[in-house]
């Protein structure tokens, strides 16, 4: 999960010439790209930095590239002064992904490492899921572009849609890279990703609602261009009587804030509870208890006669995304749903991830 921090890393890919293309990538290029992506995750998305170690080794490079791409897209609102520039940068990333899938990755660390992951996938299993992977990445980019302005969500349903199209989509992409095409595992990923996306919005409140610090660029520090923002759904804010300006001025003392946060956090927790119950039922040989709402959409097409237990074991490392979100929601509850008072996970998070993997429990 993206940990909201205003670390102003430059968008390296955007500063590179778009005309720079080559089809041959050396081992040194891949190693340099891997170091870059891992450093980004360690500094700015520690949850993903930990989980990467537990996803199946054949997709660890792809996972690192995907999560670093997500970081770059999340950072864009901090670095652009108007929507037009933001759209140009999003277009750059889409073109870079298109070229990477065409075998012409630009000299950009994320694309180089993703290209390596795609080559490894082709060597393992051909191109059976390559189309799906490209679809999911493109959906991530389009969704990030749509939400670049940091406007509040209209309601909880629109927040869930955002979470499905970002964090669930990242999980679908990783699963397709194994490759694993499983309705039940995708169904679990959908609920977990929704919980992750909602929890990320809550985690971002103390950062986005505060005046932004300067952004680091290759030329030095520059003033951040964004205004303070509060992304809580408007219906939850209205029900709790929360006003944006009061949150910007008063922070945790803003009237109704904790009530609104409680309502949103409850929805995230509901998705985790649903995923846990589903996992228990599936491991017991039962049906999941409810239908997958996205079955038949986009790339959600599956074959009959699959081995559910084998698929769960194969994809369980990806489902570990649930653990950081679950721990955050627990700490949020301990702080009486004051997002400004949530403590860090510390040493408990890596231990909890390892335990979850060992026991196959989320």
Can you name each region flagged by the protein language model?
Residues 145-156:
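Acidic/His metal-coordination segments adjacent to aromatic residues that form catalytic metal sites
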Residues 15:
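Short, surface-exposed polybasic-aromatic patches that bind anionic ligands, especially phosphate groups
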